[in-house]
């Protein structure tokens, strides 16, 4: 299963996951490995941009969910 992604893609996914998860040591680890594999800064920027968009959508949906819960006083499922 680990071989399903090539090493460059694996590191870009790691960069995106680290960005979305706010893990600076994880980002640095995958960033260094990605550069060693020849990943371009444009590719890194694309992964970070995508991660930020995913994170922002999740944050927005969670805020909306919390607001609904607080205004309806309905117990959580």
Positions of predicted regions on the chain:
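Hydrophobic alpha-helical segments
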Residues: 1-77
């Amino acid at each position: 299963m680990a071989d399903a992604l090539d090493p460059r893609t694996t590191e870009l996914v790691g960069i995106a996951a680290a960005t979305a998860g706010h893990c600076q040591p994880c980002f640095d680890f995958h960033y260094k490995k990605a550069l060693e594999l020849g990943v371009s800064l444009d590719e890194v920027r694309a992964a970070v941009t995508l991660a930020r968009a995913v994170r922002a959508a999740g944050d927005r949906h969670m805020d909306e969910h919390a607001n609904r819960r607080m205004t309806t006083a309905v117990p959580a499922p």
